[in-house]
Amino acid sequence: MKTLADAFHHTLKDIYYAENALTKAMPKMISAADGDVKSAFEDHLKETREHVKILKKVFATIDKPAEGEKCDAIEGLIKETEGIIQEASGKALGACLIGAAQAVEHYEIARYGTLRQWAKELKNDEAHDLLSQILDMEKAANAKLTGIAVAAA
């Protein structure tokens, strides 16, 4: 990567891969969870599918095809979550699933915050607005998970 535009495109492909990977991983989390945690995961799966649609629009703003590039970070977080599902049970399972989901949210918040700022620097107002929408949704999802964790404590 030699330019900010290159970095933007690379990171956009990274988060696109991550969101698509999450749409495949989240059903396992939903199956393992119950109560408010399950409901929050179901809601977030719907939002994640919406994020993929919005990201396609961001790709269009830079005249690039919507395609992912393997994201080792999200693969690691998904693998960790799969281990939690196999090893944890009872109240610990719910708490660990919330922690795993928040690790994903924090990764996404960092990526979307970076992309949004880069879109601003690249004077791509449409991408900035679209990425702001997703960033706001990710922050809200994280806050919802925090609320569930606090209520369960």
Question: Where in the sequence are the language-model features?
Answer:
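Amphipathic alpha-helical hairpins
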Residues: 1-153
